[in-house]
Swiss-Prot record:
SUPFAM superfamilies: Triosephosphate isomerase (TIM). Keywords: Cytoplasm, Gluconeogenesis, Glycolysis, Isomerase. Substrate binds at N9, W10, K11, G173, S213, G234, G235. It comes from Flavobacterium johnsoniae (strain ATCC 17061 / DSM 2064 / JCM 8514 / BCRC 14874 / CCUG 350202 / NBRC 14942 / NCIMB 11054 / UW101) (Cytophaga johnsonae). PROSITE patterns: TIM_1, TIM_2. Homodimer. GO terms for molecular function: triose-phosphate isomerase activity. This is Triosephosphate isomerase. The keyword Transferase does not apply. The gene is tpiA. It catalyses: D-glyceraldehyde 3-phosphate = dihydroxyacetone phosphate. Involved in the gluconeogenesis. Catalyzes stereospecifically the conversion of dihydroxyacetone phosphate (DHAP) to D-glyceraldehyde-3-phosphate (G3P).
Length: 250
């Protein structure tokens, strides 16, 4: 049975004091037993403190990015070894903002996936179409190509370390949200694409999260769809009560 997951991507928000405050709220408010695995992804500078604070809780911690190299002269970058050495064993890769703002290509993201898996990290792999792709009817092709280029090269045994996060880019930070029916349609397509490539066992086990402006008001309906296994949450993850409402919507 595949896992339900709610992951909060904090992006470039929360300084050290604010991070501690939000973590304290989440620890106090999120029940010890939930139907979903709960993960938060603070900024790099607050990861070590977050990992230490959450160590004996049921809340997991993730990095928002990692460099593809093992180490070396890469000013400003963070390696997988550095992350795992502080107890961070999950990483978000391929996020639409990394693709658009920092020009990360499918090939680069695939290299990052390989590096993370080499260090036994869980990868939350993000992918999804832009508005022009959906308007032109090309959204299924775009999603399939990003999947194939990003993760279809990995060995079957590595799929237990992969979580997929479908991001309709046109519904991120815009206030727009794919309808629950649109989300289910794409998630079903994604699962079927994986089934054709890797077989039913992997397709049925991989968790596919929805990552397009999930809020307390729409979470329950989106999460009720059979192929939606949770969410990658942005803005709503920055307020404890909003994030709690989304976590408990599963």
């Amino acid at each position: 049975m595949r896992k339900s997951i709610v992951a909060g991507n904090w992006k470039m928000h929360k300084n050290a004091a604010q991070t501690e405050e939000l973590l304290n709220e989440l620890i106090a408010k999120i029940p010890a037993k939930t139907n979903a695995q709960v993960i938060v992804a603070p900024t790099f500078v607050n990861l070590q403190a977050a990992a230490a604070k959450l160590k004996n809780t049921t809340i997991g911690v993730s990095a928002q990015n990692v460099h593809q190299a093992e180490g070396g002269a890469f000013t400003g970058e963070i390696s997988a070894d550095m992350l795992t050495s502080i107890g961070v064993n999950t990483v978000i890769l391929g996020h639409s903002e990394r693709r658009a703002i920092f020009h990360e290509t499918d090939a680069l993201i695939a290299n990052k996936v390989d590096t993370a898996l080499k260090h036994d990290m869980t990868v939350i792999f993000c992918f999804g179409e832009e508005l022009k792709d959906r308007q032109s009817g090309n959204h299924f092709n775009i999603v399939e190509n990003q999947l194939r280029d990003g993760v279809f090269h990995i060995a079957k045994e590595s799929w237990s370390k992969i979580v997929l996060a479908y991001e309709p880019v046109w519904a991120i930070g815009t206030g727009e949200t794919a309808s629950p029916e649109q989300a289910q349609e794409m998630h079903e397509f994604i699962r079927e694409t994986i089934r054709k490539a890797f077989g039913a066992e992997i397709a049925d086990e991989v968790s596919i999260l929805y990552g397009g402006s999930v809020k307390p008001e729409n979470a329950k309906e989106i999460f009720s769809k059979p192929d939606v296994d949770g969410g990658l949450i942005g803005g709503a993850a920055l307020k404890a009560d909003d994030f709690l409402a989304i976590v408990t919507a599963i």
